[in-house]
Regions:
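A short acidic, Gly/Pro-enriched loop at the edge of an enzyme's catalytic core
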Residues: 77-89
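Residue-level recognition of tetratricopeptide repeat
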Residues: 220, 224, 268, 301-302
Length: 648
């Protein structure tokens, strides 16, 4: 895989470089696979092994060796009859005059291992024709470029900070102090390198190698899929070798790579196989088998079939039934402060609207002020049905803290799990709320337990309770954790429906996550349909209300807006069965229809496409079910019921 020849230019101010400081800053990006390294520095440089980053010698899987040489000694060193080859050779700049790397290219390439890298720190033009020609003569090529940016441009305690270029031909508009260039053999294959490290029992360095793959390589979809799937495989191998209880965080990261791999190539079997094995490690063989049955139905492979046969197919049972206690208003209503984020957030915003309706304007306040809750229009996410016209004025941080200290609020809901609020502001709010319970409200696309990280950020010992949208049925999250999926704003639910629904099946949306792309492309071929049409929000609602069946897949978060939106608009929900806890969920075949995998989806489409009366009846019951259990107001009452139970 060869990127096109590219050239770039950059201004390099004449800034003195300390080799010791250089070494200290290099530790942020040197590849972890390096076991033996030669450092070449000028005669005038004060350089010792102790200057080099300790991480090269403290890695778990092997000892690192760092050797030093001056340019005048280099050729003699490499002409010795026997010496161990190096994983990397680093050329440092002279502090007094330009260091010419080019004359040494012909002698150092033979001192490298087959996967070895050369690093060169220079103020010179990164892609000069002379350099590229000399590299070509010894079968080396430019791989990665880092630019040293002044600390005035990049927040750093050092005088400069390294910034990796997204592309080799990227032109920096800001001044660049100097560059670090990485060169590799022309036949260098990062996937083969990573797999060799993985088979050698080093999943961390294997994963690290893949983080350096240049973006230009990843523009090829099959290559991107292979790299992302291999990164997920490294995480799986890492998890299999560990016993630290961190399977859930690793799976969360692996799921992101699964989404990227299958978006680039929906037939990438390795991505599905790794995803399935992570489900198995969490104790959910049912999800593991479902994942593999989908890819096997579309593009069967023998090795995938072998893995599929190792899984049992029994659905995971929730650790306990989830039915929120009924909330009774009583004589006094709780006064709630909700700490929210600074952009439209469907889960938080719909819940706020529900709390507003249940408690009234005097009993619920958001901070910071979010205009989209009060008639403002967002620049992004405008198509999500979570904009409201509720009364409310902006308040300052000082006002919020004063009201907390004066006892205006009975509890605090912290919903900014992404921590968009400045930390010092968040700490001021939490300190002012030291006499009331603090609950964590986690509406992210994230099935990890985020309590420890947010507790640490807020300097809290614990939360009074944890409300979580993405709560896997196969995982025990401990006490004080309650499932709180999305809901649907009741004012957006139509009260009448068209007599004629001319469309059988509706889908519109992103294809990136889960089995979406695999399934949609299969259905388009199988039924000669097209799901690529894009709609305005008004067109979207109109066509959804004119369709008998609304199709829904899990996203990066398993809970989706469409899961509630489809039945709320009177269409039959045909949805991928969720692996998450959903109180008062739809009943399969009664108020919705669930499918486990692509063959199951195909079978149910064929059936309900020819049984319109059943489809209509299920759609009506689904609409009634949303109105009975899953409106914004009802979700707010579920939350309040659990809070009341917790605070007794």
């Amino acid at each position: 895989l060869k990127p096109p020849d590219r050239k770039s230019s950059s201004d390099s101010p004449d800034t003195e470089i300390s080799p010791v400081l250089l070494f200290q800053t290099l530790q942020g990006f040197l590849p972890e696979f390096i076991q033996r390294m030669l450092v070449v520095a000028s005669e005038n440089a004060t350089l010792t092994k102790s200057s080099f980053p300790q991480k090269l010698e403290d890695a778990d899987h092997s000892e690192r060796v760092v050797e030093f040489a001056t340019p005048s000694y280099l050729e003699a060193l490499l002409e010795q009859n026997s010496y161990a080859k190096y994983d990397a050779i680093l050329f440092c700049p002279d502090t007094e005059r330009p260091f010419d790397f080019v004359p040494y290219v012909h002698i150092i390439s033979k001192a490298l291992t087959p996967q070895g890298w050369i690093f060169w720190v220079t103020r010179s033009e990164p892609c000069s024709a002379d350099l590229l020609d000399r590299l070509n003569d010894v079968n080396m090529e430019l791989y990665v470029i880092w630019d040293a940016m002044p600390s005035s441009l990049v927040a750093s305690p050092q005088p400069f900070s390294w910034v990796r270029r997204t592309r080799q031909d990227e032109i920096k508009g800001d001044p660049v102090l100097f560059h670090c260039l990485a060169f590799v053999p022309k036949n260098y294959d990062p996937l083969a390198h990573a797999r060799a490290l993985l088979l050698d029992g080093a999943p961390g360095p294997a994963f690290n190698v893949l983080t350096f793959v240049p973006e230009v390589y990843l523009e090829n979809p099959p290559v991107r899929a292979a790299v992302k799937a291999e990164q997920a495989l490294c995480l799986l191998a890492w998890d299999q070798a560990a016993s630290d209880g961190l399977t859930l965080p690793r799976f969360h990261l692996a799921q992101a790579f699964f989404a990227q791999a299958t978006a680039a190539d929906p037939h990438c079997h390795l991505a599905y196989c790794v995803q399935a094995e992570f489900w198995h490690r969490l104790g959910d063989d049912y999800m593991a088998a479902r994942t593999l049955r989908s890819i096997q139905h579309v593009a069967p492979q023998e090795t995938t079939a072998t893995q599929l046969n190792t899984y049992t197919s029994h659905p995971a049972v929730p650790t306990k039934p989830w039915e929120p206690p009924e909330w009774n208003e009583g004589t006094s209503l709780p006064r709630i402060l909700l700490i929210t984020d600074n952009r439209p957030n469907y889960g938080l915003d719909v819940l706020y609207a529900g709390l507003f309706r249940v408690l009234g304007a005097d009993h619920v306040l958001e901070f910071p002020h979010k205009p989209t809750l009060h008639g403002g229009q967002p620049e992004r996410f405008a198509d999500y049905p979570c904009c409201f016209c509720l009364p409310g004025e902006a308040v300052t941080l000082e006002q919020v803290c004063d009201e907390l200290r004066s006892g205006r609020f009975d509890l605090l809901l912290f919903g900014d799990v992404e921590r968009t609020l400045e930390r010092e502001q968040a700490l001021q709010v939490v300190r002012a709320a030291d006499r009331i319970p603090v609950f964590l409200l986690d509406m992210l696309d994230d099935f990890r337990d985020n309590r420890p990280e947010v507790c640490d950020w807020l300097q809290l010992k614990h939360f009074a309770g944890y409300f979580k949208r993405e709560m896997l049925t196969c995982v025990s999250y401990g006490n004080g954790v309650f499932p709180l999926p999305f809901a649907y704003p009741e004012e957006r639910m139509p009260t009448s429906f068209p007599e004629d629904r001319p469309y059988l099946l509706f889908w519109a949306g992103q294809r990136q996550f889960g089995i979406r792309k695999l399934a949609l492309e299969y259905l388009e071929r199988r039924f000669n349909v097209d799901f690529s049409t894009r709609y305005t929000q008004a067109e979207y609602v109109s066509i959804l209300q004119s369709s008998h069946i609304g199709l829904d897949f899990s996203g990066f978060g398993f809970d989706t807006v469409r899961y509630w939106e489809v039945p709320a608009h009177g269409a039959m929900l045909l949805a991928e069965r969720r692996p998450t806890c959903i109180p008062f969920d739809f009943t399969d075949g009664e108020s919705a229809v669930f499918f486990d995998d692509i063959p199951d989806l195909e079978k149910k489409l064929l059936y309900y496409g020819t049984h319109k009366e059943e489809t209509i009846a299920i759609a009506h019951r689904g609409y009634d079910h949303v109105k009975r259990y899953h409106t914004a107001t009802l979700r707010a009452k579920h939350l309040l019921g659990w809070i009341a139970q917790t605070m007794r």
